[in-house]
């Protein structure tokens, strides 16, 4: 995937100017920057969700799966129902929930979960979907260090051989996910 952004602005605020990067296929790439530097905007452009910019994104596939910063879950239904709504098999949902330490919470309403648990449900949704590219925006928000390590190992295993782009402000996330390439914005 080749990204060439001549200009991206919100009103008179220029977010990107003459930004070029290449994302290698089949590996995990990591984009790191402080809060407010446009990581989420860049991720949305690469995933094809933001077309309001000057430039090009050359991509071999439009089959993109995105983990947003907001969990985007249905709060009033169970964890398992949130996953089954994707049209996936219940046994696959149970397997992913088990790997994300959420099996015991499968029948609870999402509204009853902590922020970290909700983040893991959002990750489960992404990991159950089949795509060519995965774009993960701050995937470990609200997770403690031990949970991060376990989940990073599972994500790396589950998405092995896939193109994965992760944006975060935390350098350690790159190491946890075994990123092949790291791009640092704002230096």
Place the predicted regions along the sequence by residue:
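Hydrophobic anchor residue at the start of the ABC signature
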Residues: 123
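Conserved ABC ATPase "signature" region
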Residues: 90-105
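ABC-family nucleotide-binding domains
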Residues: 137, 144
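Walker B catalytic motif
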Residues: 109, 138-139
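Helix-to-loop junction immediately C-terminal to a conserved catalytic motif
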Residues: 47
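Q-loop/switch helix immediately C-terminal to the Walker
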Residues: 76-92
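Conserved ABC ATPase signature
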Residues: 109-113, 117
